[in-house]
Amino acid sequence: MYSSKKLKAYFLRLLTNTKTTKFDIKNARNILFLRYDRIGDMVITTPVFRELKREYPEINISVLASKVNQTILDNNPYVDKVYINFKNNLLRDLPTLLKLRNKKYDVCVEFDHSVIPHSIARLRIIKPKKIISVIKEGRYGVKGDELKLYDCFTDKPKDAHFRDIWLDTLRPFGVAPKSNEYDLYITDKQEEFANTYLKQYYPKCLIGINLEGAVKGKRIQFVELE
């Protein structure tokens, strides 16, 4: 009789057991990035879009974002299209995922460094030619490199900042990043709104900014805000 862990491992292997498509990643022209999580994660991923677009200006870059972090990409000249994903509601996302499948993406880049079943399910539906991800720790006794769904894993050095770990996903494209600075494109209207909002509290209240991330490797340095 199968234990629960063995049963989950069996279905994980089954879900990720796909055939390899012959395609050179360096010839990709239509790329989808999966980044449907927190605001901070999107902020420290913005260098990836810029460095890829600078190397390949003709490439079409789409991002599957969350409702929470999508506004980080407002006015970003390096992102061509943003789609919204609800993460915990696969059925609600299905129309969008099928639309993405019809786009016939050359490459999908998934940034999770763990094995995430809902990400795998979305990738199976989207069905790109190639999938790039960060090296995975494995799950249910299944090693990350056993997951045949992924065509290319990039490294995750122990003490590296996640910004640089995610920039390394551009290596299969032959891109050597020249900068890891973040991109936030604030309009005059947004700046005016922020100033008006803050004035109602200043100087009565002291306003602080939390630079910490969920993990050490996602912390934003103070000098990076200047």
Specify the residue positions occupied by each region the protein language model found.
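Catalytic machinery of carbohydrate-active enzymes
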Residues: M1-E226
